[in-house]
Swiss-Prot record:
Glycosylation, residue list: N126, N164, N180, N278, N279, N300, N301
Source taxon at top rank: Eukaryota
Binding-site residues for ATP, renumbered to this chain: L476, G477, E478, G479, A480, F481, G482, Q483, V484, K504
Active-site residue list: D610 (proton acceptor)
InterPro entries, per database record: Cadherin-like_dom, Cadherin-like_sf, Kinase-like_dom_sf, Prot_kinase_dom, Protein_kinase_ATP_BS, RTK, Ser-Thr/Tyr_kinase_cat_dom, Tyr_kinase_AS
Signal peptide bounds: 1-48
Broad class of where this protein is predominantly found: membrane
Compositionally biased tracts (Acidic residues): 243-253
Keyword Phosphoprotein annotated: no
Protein name in UniProt: Tyrosine kinase receptor Cad96Ca
Length: 773
């Protein structure tokens, strides 16, 4: 009994599975059948409504009256055609067989004496018409696009020689008559696939071209003065002229539309037949077909029913059905995957909110740092540069440093919690503490030697500052291998809160030599005590690449740029904020302050080697600070440094012994200071204007010196000239220069007459020879 019950339950479960499987298969089969049905309906509808439009044929004259004396090769007419689909068109000529019945029917000639160019549509005479005067016959001018053929009837009337003077010959070239312009530039109504009807076409035809047509539509003999055989009756496309009455349609029933032609040409019919179909097949048109009456001339008012195919009536239901089918499928899929879609939307929303908060915080911090003077000042234009992305330091080699950080962390855990190398320890990071963040500590078992000797020495000094406290903004300036960024440092140099600083670093393209130069500059600045005329070092980051040298931020920037920008303000003035117009006393004070700063560096045994206006920074209160110690060397022992490396050189600022003997000393800095004085007097002009670097070296060696500017007095120029003595021992010291400039400052004389400054004599040149400007 138990076995029977168990067997029964298993059968029920098996039946349920089969039923579920059958339902799934039925649903899938239904979807496939519906899709196939929709596709077949669309394909059938597309085949039923072939969008290929027939060509449109234009024949200027439907009645060619040609003299039998015409020469072979004469152009009879020019036929035009166009195709809305842009298909290639082929022209042709066919004989027109008249309707049966009637003795006066025009019979086609044995051979059509015309030929047409298949591409251009030019109809020419290909055989002589001599002896064929009086013949009348009909031909078809055809054009095909490969799918449909359009035909226009043309009535041919061959005239005798004596009738040539009084007869009419249709024009074969472009006429100057105004009314013939409409033959070439017709206006079209928007009717799909057929020829359009010209608005205002007269219902009556002017007399004189065709013989009068009697009431029974039988043509009589033409009024030519001779008894030629009459034209055929019931000519399709030719309607008799009925005065005061409407035109009577012909007996032939053809779905055609009249061609819009000149008012002087008769109306005709265009017969459209597919090439592959029988010529008797009716071509359904989008316009009602014309109906005819019997030859009795009575007009039939009742029109026969005609099926009008509409593209909208067939395609709209199909499109709606298919669209509804796909919408239903989309709704079903969205319902089934609603949980995943909601999770994706929540993730995107959170990401967008985080980005907006980050942007708002960055904008608020930037706006709180920049003052109105820094925004509006014309001098601050040189500070504009690319903005850092996300205000976050990103190391160059992430993968390598991730491995280093992992090894350092594991080492710290092994040593019982002692700080590992390179990992910031809790602290202020201020220069006043001997063990700040980033300092190397650890016991005997600690591993992780510094990458280089310079970094090893710097990691345990008071200048190390944690990188995460730096927030980068924009580039203040850059050279071939270095960059200076404007940053914000938190709690640096004993100052609580945020301090704006300048961070000097190297580009990724820098070489090992450039890296050593930056570390050498850092060592030079570490040996200096704070001085008002020397840029102050605030800290550094040397625990790993890239090395950061943190300097005080001088908001006015380079003295060279400041002097050049003062030229425009001297002429046009400053309408915003504090005026920057410089005076003779200001310029002399700049020289005095630079001399004070260089005297301090000299007393500490420092040779600058690149003293120029571009390496002097200036503050809002016109305080000058010597900066850029990239070439500086500590030569306190020998007093002389001999250059061994190659690179860009400030040729126009270098002394003769530096140019030719590679010898640098305090006296070579004195020479450069004289050039700096000339720069200040000329408001930032390039020394030796108009002379190449090679000529400068040769002329300076031969005794040539910078000439005295016109607006500079002799007393000030003499100080410059003393600095350019060929013998270094004859040049003054910085202490002596300070005394001479101090005397000039205490007099009321303007030694720089800026009102006489010749703007046209001094200009700035670009570096073309690899020199440093």
């Amino acid at each position: 009994m138990v076995y029977h019950h168990h067997n029964h339950e298993s059968r029920i479960i098996h039946c349920r599975k089969q039923l579920t499987s059958w339902r799934r298969r039925s649903l899938l089969l239904t979807i496939i059948v519906v899709t196939a049905t929709v596709v077949s309906l669309i394909s059938q509808e597309a085949e039923a409504h072939n969008q290929n439009a027939p060509p449109i044929l234009y024949v200027r004259e439907r009645n060619w009256r040609i003299s039998e004396t015409e020469k072979v090769g004469q152009i009879i007419d020019r036929v035009r055609a166009e195709d809305p689909d842009g298909d290639d068109l082929i022209f042709g000529i066919e004989p027109r067989f008249s309707l049966p019945g009637g003795e006066n029917d025009a019979s086609p000639p044995e051979k059509i004496p015309f030929q047409i160019d298949r591409e251009t549509g030019v109809v020419t005479l290909n055989e002589s018409l001599a002896g064929r005067a009086g013949q009348n016959f009909l031909i078809y001018i055809t054009v095909t696009d490969g799918s449909y053929t359009a035909k226009n009837e043309v009535f041919i009337n061959i005239l005798g020689e004596r009738e040539n003077s009084s007869g009419y010959r249709p024009q074969t070239s472009i006429s100057n008559v105004v009314h013939n312009i409409s033959q070439f530039l017709p206006r079209f109504d928007q009717l799909p696939g057929v020829q359009s009807i010209r608005n205002g076409l007269p219902n009556s035809r002017p007399g004189g071209w065709y013989p009068p047509v009697p009431q029974n539509n039988i043509f009589g003999p033409p009024p030519f003065g001779n008894n030629y055989p009459p034209p055929p009756p019931n000519i399709p496309g030719v309607r008799g002229e009925q005065s005061g009455e409407e035109e009577q349609p012909d007996e032939e029933v053809t779905p055609t539309t009249p061609v819009r032609i000149s008012s002087t040409t008769p109306k005709s019919r265009t017969k459209l037949t597919p090439i592959t179909a029988n010529n008797s097949t009716r071509v359904e048109s989008a316009i009602p077909a014309e109906t005819t009456t019997p030859s009795g001339g009575h007009h039939n008012n009742s029109s026969s029913p005609i099926t009008i195919f509409s593209l909208k009536s067939g395609t709209i239901p199909i499109v709606v059905t298919v669209g509804g089918f796909f919408v239903a499928i989309a709704v079903l899929l969205a319902y089934l995957c609603r949980r995943r879609l909601c999770a994706i939307s929540r993730t995107l929303k959170k990401t967008k909110e985080k980005e907006e908060l980050a942007k708002k915080s960055n904008q608020s911090q930037l706006s709180s740092t920049l003052t109105d003077d820094s925004r509006n000042s014309m001098v601050m234009q040189q500070w504009q540069g690319p903005v850092a992305f996300a205000n976050r330091y990103v190391p160059w080699e992430r993968d390598q440093q991730m491995g280093i950080a992992t090894s350092q962390l594991s080492t710290g855990v092994t040593n019982g919690g002692v700080s590992s190398p390179g990992v910031p320890s809790p602290g202020t990071g201020e220069p006043g503490s001997n063990l700040g963040p980033g300092c190397l500590t650890g016991g005997a078992g600690s591993s992780g030697a510094p990458e280089n000797a310079f970094a090893g020495e710097a990691n345990c000094d008071r200048w190390e500052f944690p990188r995460y406290r730096l927030k980068f903004f924009n580039i203040l300036g850059e050279g071939a291998f270095g960059q200076v960024w404007r940053c914000e440092a938190t709690n640096i140099n004993g100052n609580e809160g945020i301090t704006t600083v300048a961070v000097k670093t190297l580009k990724e393209s820098a070489t090992e030599v450039d890296r050593k130069d930056l570390l050498s500059e850092l060592e030079v600045m570490k040996s200096l005590e704070p001085h008002i005329n020397v840029v102050h070092l605030l800290g550094c980051c040397t625990d790993k690449d890239p090395t950061f040298v943190i300097l005080e931020y001088v908001n006015r920037g380079k003295l060279q740029t400041y002097l050049r920008s003062s030229r425009a303000e001297r002429h046009y003035g400053n309408t915003h904020g504090k005026s920057n117009v410089l005076t003779s006393c200001d310029l002399t004070s700049f020289m005095y302050q630079v001399a004070k700063g260089m005297d301090y560096l000299t007393s500490r045994g420092i040779i600058h080697r690149d003293l120029a206006a571009r390496n002097i920074l200036i503050t809002d209160d016109h305080t000058c600070k010597v900066a850029d110690f990239g070439f500086a060397r500590d030569v306190i022992t020998s007093k002389i440094y001999e250059r061994k490396s190659e690179g860009k050189l400030p040729i126009r600022w270098m002394a003769t012994e530096s140019l030719y003997d590679n010898i640098f000393s305090v006296k070579s800095d004195i020479w450069s200071f004289g050039i700096l004085m000339w720069e200040i007097v000329t408001l930032g002009s390039t020394p030796y204007p108009g002379i190449s670097a090679a000529d400068v070296m040769r002329k300076v060696r031969d005794g040539y010196r910078l000439e005295k500017p016109e607006h500079c007095r002799r007393e000030l120029y003499n100080i410059m000239y003393y600095c350019w003595s060929h013998d270094p021992q004859e040049r003054p010291l910085f202490a002596e220069i300070i005394q001479m400039l101090d005397k000039l400052l205490h007099t009321e004389m303007d030694y720089i007459e800026l009102e006489r400054f010749p703007d046209h004599n001094y200009y700035n040149i670009v570096s073309l020879s690899g020199e440093k400007l």
